[in-house]
Amino acid sequence: MQKSLITKWLFISCIMVIAMIVIGGITRLTGSGLSIVEWRPVTGILPPFSFESWQAEFAKYKAFPEYNSINYGMTLSQFKFIYLLEFVHRLLGRITALIYIVPLIYFYFKDVIKNRDILPYIIALLLFCVQGFMGWYMVKSGLLNSPSVSHFRLAFHLIIAVIIYHILFYQLIKNRCDILLIPSQTDLKLPLIFSGIAITVIYVQIFLGAMVAGLDAGLIYNSFPLMGDNFIPMEIKDNFFNLANLHDPVFIQFIHRLGGYSVFLVVVVLVICLLKIEHPKLNKIAYFLMIALLMQISTGIITLLYSVPIIIASIHQLFAIILLSIIIWCYFIIKTS
């Protein structure tokens, strides 16, 4: 009974974090992230209701660079749309934190979660706190001189969410999955190594994807597999190893493409390793991996070719989490077998 409660709680928490990641991506893609120019963790739980309240929020927004540089002349109705998207994102963040924290306190004091098992839950709790601050720290970067947020802060904001999800999902499968019985003579070293490498490469790729979004780098070189007429674009060919390139949309898009090739190669090798073991459960994971990988690659290419359509770009982001989840599941099964 207690194990079932923990499993349900962790499952709901994981779904909420995924929803936060996807809605956060939509907020970025629609240019809604800078519409709320204040950080009010407690008093900001309700949106404006009266016409006067909306006018007051709109007046605050008009005082910052995004309105004057990008959205000058925006109507109140248009402002309401971007405001409510950002509001939903922030509200969902609060709800997600409560869904995680309140049961955690209950489970701990009821001794459902033992002291020996509490550490990952505490780390996730601390990361929830850091994430709230990081979200505002990111937004603040777009309220100064530039009408866009720092792509570095955006990437860290996303990666913290992914780490939180990783911790919760790992605890979920730890509570839910049985240990797989594999013959002792089976060599699991290679699939364990490549599942670890795959997790690392996907983390890097998610970070780069956030930087692409932050720099609007998906709106340039909308061709594949070449960038224009070249594999390496001319703008960076002669100046590749320069730290200034980390602010260059062309360079970041190119590196993100390389990351995609890396993910493909590593996951394909992992799939081959799993299929060679000839175990039904691991073979099933291999098939799931290939489906998720193909979906991730195809949505990424479509996102690029069609200049970042919001729905496809959101699905692309979602499948990054799905692909990561399957590999974490794979890693857990191999490690505990």
Curated annotation (Swiss-Prot):
InterPro entries: COX15/CtaA_fam, HemeA_Synthase_type2
Annotated GO CC locations: plasma membrane
Membrane-crossing segments per the record: 6-26, 93-113, 118-138, 154-174, 192-212, 258-278, 285-305, 308-328
Essential cofactor(s): heme b
GO molecular function, one term: oxidoreductase activity, acting on NAD(P)H, heme protein as acceptor
Binding site for heme: H256, H316
Subcellular location: Cell membrane
Recorded metabolic or biological pathway in which this protein acts: Porphyrin-containing compound metabolism; heme A biosynthesis; heme A from heme O: step 1/1
Enzyme class: oxidoreductase
Catalysed reactions, as listed in the record: Fe(II)-heme o + 2 A + H2O = Fe(II)-heme a + 2 AH2
EC number: 1.17.99.9
GO biological process entries: heme A biosynthetic process
Topological type in the membrane: Multi-pass membrane protein
Protein keywords: Cell membrane, Heme biosynthesis, Iron, Membrane, Metal-binding, Oxidoreductase, Transmembrane, Transmembrane helix
Family of the protein in this entry: Belongs to the COX15/CtaA family. Type 2 subfamily.
PANTHER family: CYTOCHROME C OXIDASE ASSEMBLY PROTEIN COX15, CYTOCHROME C OXIDASE ASSEMBLY PROTEIN COX15 HOMOLOG
Role description: Catalyzes the conversion of heme O to heme A by two successive hydroxylations of the methyl group at C8. The first hydroxylation forms heme I, the second hydroxylation results in an unstable dihydroxymethyl group, which spontaneously dehydrates, resulting in the formyl group of heme A.
Subunit (UniProt): Interacts with CtaB.
Protein name: Heme A synthase
Organism from which the protein derives: Rickettsia felis (strain ATCC VR-1525 / URRWXCal2)
